[in-house]
Amino acid sequence: MASAGMQILGVVLTLLGWVNGLVSCALPMWKVTAFIGNSIVVAQVVWEGLWMSCVVQSTGQMQCKVYDSLLALPQDLQAARALCVIALLVALFGLLVYLAGAKCTTCVEEKDSKARLVLTSGIVFVISGVLTLIPVCWTAHAIIRDFYNPLVAEAQKRELGASLYLGWAASGLLLLGGGLLCCTCPSGGSQGPSHYMARYSTSAPAISRGPSEYPTKNYV
């Protein structure tokens, strides 16, 4: 029962991590306008994401534009776009592997095979968490580097957006959920002795006949 509860908790955490990763990848809030120096009061705020950039006016009106060229993006955003998509696909693959080995499904009958599939899904979720963490940390490093670079104009400096925090949360949930699934895998060596004991218990003991059960003609 404890193992089943840990599996359910692990899958719930990984699903929450996958949803956070999807929202982080879709929202255009990886980089936001930095309010420093003379730009404390501005008429518009710029949001930059993986797929589009948005400009929010002081009146509340927002205009978004999809990037025309992939090569025009900064290097960190190009890598983040590719790694985020790969991480989401890897997490989906891990979910399919888990469903094949879950205790509530009948895709695989043997308990050892189910345990191996659950362990594999946990490893896949951990890989997905690492793939999610890399672009988020890379983009955050680029933002902080440019923010403290005196050669970058204040109007071009950016701050950490909400998508980065969602990405960190997604990575943590995927790593934690995958780790729980890996810990629920039972050791296969404990099932061997019980298997042989059951085999020996099925054999019936031999019954010896008493002297009175033999035919009397053998003594004539």
Curated annotation (Swiss-Prot):
GO molecular function, one term: identical protein binding
Membrane topology listed for this record: Multi-pass membrane protein
Entry's localization field: Cell junction, Tight junction; Cell membrane
Superkingdom as given in the UniProt entry: Eukaryota
Region called Interactions with TJP1, TJP2 and TJP3, residue ranges: 219-220
Phosphoserine modifications at: 201, 203, 208, 212
Residue intervals on the Cytoplasmic side: 1-7, 103-116, 182-220
Keywords assigned by UniProt, alphabetized: Cell junction, Cell membrane, Host cell receptor for virus entry, Host-virus interaction, Membrane, Phosphoprotein, Receptor, Tight junction, Transmembrane, Transmembrane helix
Transmembrane residue ranges: 8-28, 82-102, 117-137, 161-181
Tissue specificity as recorded in UniProt: Expressed in the liver, in peripheral blood mononuclear cells and hepatocarcinoma cell lines.
Pfam families the record matches: PMP22_Claudin
Major site of localization recorded for this protein: other
Ranges per topology, Extracellular: 29-81, 138-160
GO annotation (BP), single: calcium-independent cell-cell adhesion via plasma membrane cell-adhesion molecules
GO cellular component entries: apicolateral plasma membrane; bicellular tight junction; plasma membrane
InterPro entries in alphabetical order: Claudin, Claudin6, Claudin_CS, PMP22/EMP/MP20/Claudin
Assigned protein family: Belongs to the claudin family.
Quaternary data: Directly interacts with TJP1/ZO-1, TJP2/ZO-2 and TJP3/ZO-3. Interacts with CLDN1, CD81 and OCLN.
Primary role: Plays a major role in tight junction-specific obliteration of the intercellular space. (Microbial infection) Acts as a receptor for hepatitis C virus (HCV) entry into hepatic cells.
Record's protein name: Claudin-6
Natural source organism: Homo sapiens
